[in-house]
Design a protein with these regions (language model features):
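Internal alpha-helical scaffold of NAD(P)-dependent oxidoreductase catalytic cores
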Residues: 14, 25, 49-57, 74-161
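Conserved active-site and cofactor/substrate-binding residues in soluble primary-metabolism enzymes
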Residues: 10-13, 17, 41, 45, ...
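Rossmann-like NAD(P)(H) cofactor-binding subdomain of soluble oxidoreductases
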Residues: 4-74, 90-92
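NAD(P)-dependent Rossmann-like dehydrogenase/reductase catalytic/cofactor-binding core
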Residues: 124-128, 153-163, 169-252
């Protein structure tokens, strides 16, 4: 790994300001985004924000918790970049025995998989917190994944990417673990208990940004819209549950 490579694990909502404040440190350097989200103010993905500072950009995402990686536990992630040579070198330099990296050119798919699963994790947490049961969680994960695929494909992503580590893999981990900040935040919402406001919950801002974009594209994303409405306080848990359960049945 070259010392010139910059790995950015800054929360997505702070990435633009961080880059502006550290412009001299980042300009024309290889940049690797490790954050998962969509900027609420601009609707931009991390790679789009970084593209203003460098032409050599990659994103790294997938099912992982920092604490597991720090302990050397087996982890598999995905690296994505539009630069094949840069991508292969990164994969070779970073991969280790317990840290496997796969590669793809589908930057959009990798980024949106990592961003959108946070919204669904909040929804699953709400279901568990509101004591709706594991069957409800499974339904939210499955239908939520359909929303993820539809939104990502509308932005040019490949369905194959969403069924891989950065999409389905990350969704499975985040919706089923109390290590997930987004899931735990959802649980707090569901049981109406306070949540540590100093904790980063990327899914909140992402839900707002994605809901707005989905409306402009004419995409139906009821789970995402419900999370957005709940977080902004325009709907109650009871109203959201009733709304989702009263949707017309259709072919899967």
């Amino acid at each position: 790994m070259c010392i010139r490579d910059r790995f950015l694990a800054v929360p997505t909502q702070n990435l633009a300001s961080f880059c502006k404040e550290n412009k001299s440190f980042l300009t024309d350097r290889p940049l690797i985004a490790c954050c998962k989200g969509v900027d609420q103010a601009t609707g931009l993905r991390p790679s789009e924000i970084l593209s203003e500072h460098s032409s050599k950009i990659a994103v790294m995402s997938g099912p992982s918790f920092a604490v597991d990686i720090s302990k050397g536990m087996p982890t598999a992630l995905v690296l994505a970049s539009a630069e094949p040579g840069f991508l292969r070198k990164l994969q070779s330099d970073i991969s280790m025995h317990n840290f496997r990296l796969y590669r793809t050119s589908d930057v959009v798919g990798v980024e949106l998989g990592g961003a959108l699963k946070n919204i669904i994790a909040i929804a699953c947490g709400i279901a568990i917190g509101a004591k709706q049961g594991d069957s409800a969680r499974a339904a939210l994960m499955t239908r939520g994944f359909s929303e993820m695929v539809a939104f990502a494909q509308a932005h040019g992503a490949k369905e194959k990417t969403l069924t891989g580590l950065s999409g389905l893999g990350d969704l499975s981990l985040t919706c089923n673990s109390e290590k997930s900040r987004n899931f735990v935040f959802g649980v707090s919402l569901g049981c109406q208990k306070p949540f540590n406001k100093n904790t980063t919950v990327e899914g909140v801002a992402t839900a707002f940004a994605v809901s707005q974009k989905a409306r402009s594209l004419g995409l139906e994303m009821p789970i995402t819209s419900s999370v957005s409405a709940l977080v902004e306080g325009s709907a109650s848990i009871e109203e959201v549950i009733n709304s989702l359960l009263s949707r017309p049945t259709k072919e899967e």
